[in-house]
């Protein structure tokens, strides 16, 4: 049954991509492209938090928007958004198919800031896949590449998320000092970009984890308490991570 379902999913992905490739031959005029890209950015902003809650619903919406879009770059941006949904539903094979299709598209295009954004999204998702299967060396390389590409792009407001992934990869490799440095850079990026404070709690409890491992409980408490101040505004999965980390922190302190 599971194998049959995987085949259906792959067939649907290739069917959708067929429409994408047909539409990729003739991009619209600049005004249309600008309007469509703004529509994508609005879609991403509105549905971003829902990916972790209703991933399949967001995926279906993204596929529908992708079919409606005329410009090929916009189509592939919608396709890239489905990558997060496959990660949430643990359909890593499907995610890898989509990543390869996006990479193939990028290789046929001229370099630009928008292409850097799209390629950064792919490398970030590749890093997440490597992290999911425990290949942290490859994950760290992908996250670093995603960060470098995003800094050449236009949507740098997502850089703190990539830096958190990079910090976590270094922590899991045992490079705690480097992990802490990436977390601190993420905080600096949040401040310099005037990003909402709701982005900061995951960085705070990431730093708390680093310091409890280093047995620096004063710094651990400081960052963990900062994270706790935003508990009411956390998403359900963020609350789970926060509370789970709370148990781990107190267990570590007891030993």
Where are these regions (language model features)?
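N-terminal leader/linker segments that initiate helical-solenoid repeat arrays
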Residues: 25-78
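Conserved small/polar residues in nucleotide/adenosyl-binding loops
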Residues: 250-255
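Flexible helix-coil transition and linker loops at the boundaries of alpha-helical arrays
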Residues: 64-73, 105-116, 150-156, 190-197, ...
């Amino acid at each position: 049954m599971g194998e049959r379902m995987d085949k259906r999913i792959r067939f649907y992905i290739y069917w959708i991509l067929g429409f994408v490739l047909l539409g990729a031959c003739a991009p619209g005029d600049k005004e249309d492209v600008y309007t469509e890209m703004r529509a994508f950015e609005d879609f991403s902003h509105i549905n971003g938090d829902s990916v972790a809650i209703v991933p399949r619903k967001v995926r279906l919406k993204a596929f529908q928007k992708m079919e409606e879009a005329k410009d090929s770059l916009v189509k592939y941006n919608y396709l890239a958004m489905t990558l997060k949904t496959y990660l949430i539903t643990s359909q890593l094979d499907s995610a890898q198919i989509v990543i390869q299709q996006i990479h193939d598209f990028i290789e046929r295009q001229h370099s630009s800031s928008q292409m850097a954004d799209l390629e950064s999204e792919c490398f970030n998702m590749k890093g997440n896949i490597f992290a999911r299967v425990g290949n942290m060396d490859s994950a760290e390389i992908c996250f670093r590449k995603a960060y470098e590409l995003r800094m050449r792009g236009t949507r740098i407001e997502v850089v703190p998320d990539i830096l958190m992934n990079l910090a976590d990869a270094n922590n899991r490799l045992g490079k705690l000092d480097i992990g802490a440095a990436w977390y601190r850079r993420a905080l600096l990026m949040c401040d310099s970009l005037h990003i909402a404070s709701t982005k900061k709690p995951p960085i705070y409890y990431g730093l708390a984890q680093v310091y409890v491992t280093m047995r620096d409980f004063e710094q651990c408490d400081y960052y963990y308490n900062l994270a706790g101040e935003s508990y009411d505004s956390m998403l359900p999965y963020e609350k789970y991570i926060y509370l789970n980390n709370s148990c781990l922190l107190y267990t570590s302190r007891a030993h």
